[in-house]
């Protein structure tokens, strides 16, 4: 467990009050344990990061988090790194991006999403709070009761245990040698250097 977590948004849909819901799901790749399923108002990093903060606090840190190339996991900037994935790196987690337009590379996660959609969103909940109650009930049943063929018909909870790598209370500051010159890299992967615009690759 915790060698690889997979994370993804299950698209979006409207709850019955007309508001959009974006379910963020995180799964342990080894045990298929559904660590989190949180309905959010958007895919913005300021909504996604607290979900990961809570999961890291409760379950510890994985070695790798595998995602697609969408927001907030990746960007078009240098190395496709997002603010979220840089935070993961500082925590000692390796972000792993699947190839664009190849969701089958996260196939186990996609299969879970089909089940989640069928059992919790048809029809959708009355509002985000009601929808979250459905996600919570699904997660409990999926983890603790539902047999899984790859686990010899045992539920995911039988094969999962939290990571021994704990979330640090504080990140160590980034330190550079004294002769380094620091520059802020823009969103289009460039810096100002000696009065010129330079693309950083």
Question: What residue ranges belong to the model's regions?
Answer:
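Mobile-element integrase/transposase regions
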Residues: 1-27, 33, 45-62, 89-90, ...
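Short, solvent-exposed helix-loop connector elements
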Residues: 97-100, 118-133, 195-201
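RNase H-like two-metal-ion nuclease catalytic core shared by retroviral integrases
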Residues: 67-69, 73-89, 95-117, 131, ...
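Mobile genetic element proteins and their domesticated derivatives, centered on retroelements
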Residues: 8, 26, 32, 52, ...
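Basic, flexible linker segments flanking DNA-binding modules
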Residues: 1-6, 12, 71, 82, ...
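C-terminal, beta-rich DNA-binding module of retroviral/retroelements integrases
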Residues: 143-201
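Acidic/polar loop patches that form or flank catalytic/metal-binding clefts of enzymes
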Residues: 63-67, 96-99, 125-128, 147-153
């Amino acid at each position: 467990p915790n060698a690889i977590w997979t994370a993804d948004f299950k698209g979006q849909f409207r709850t019955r009050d007309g508001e959009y819901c974006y379910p963020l799901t995180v799964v342990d790749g080894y045990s298929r344990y559904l660590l989190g399923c949180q309905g959010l108002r958007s895919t913005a990093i300021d909504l996604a990061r607290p979900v990961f903060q809570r999961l890291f606090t409760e379950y510890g840190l994985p070695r790798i988090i595998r995602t697609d190339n969408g927001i907030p996991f990746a960007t078009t900037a240098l190395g496709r790194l997002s603010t979220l994935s840089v935070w993961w790196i500082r925590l000692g987690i390796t972000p792993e991006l699947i190839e664009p337009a190849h969701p089958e590379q996260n196939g186990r996660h996609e299969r879970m999403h089909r089940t989640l959609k069928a059992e919790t969103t048809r029809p959708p909940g009355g509002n985000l709070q009601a929808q979250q109650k459905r996600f919570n009930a699904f997660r409990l049943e999926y983890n603790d009761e539902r047999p899984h063929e790859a686990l010899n018909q045992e539920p995911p909870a039988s094969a999962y245990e939290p990571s021994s790598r704990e979330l640090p209370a504080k990140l160590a500051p980034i330190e550079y040698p004294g002769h380094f010159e620091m520059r802020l890299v823009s969103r289009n992967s460039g810096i100002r250097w000696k009065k010129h615009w330079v693309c950083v690759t």
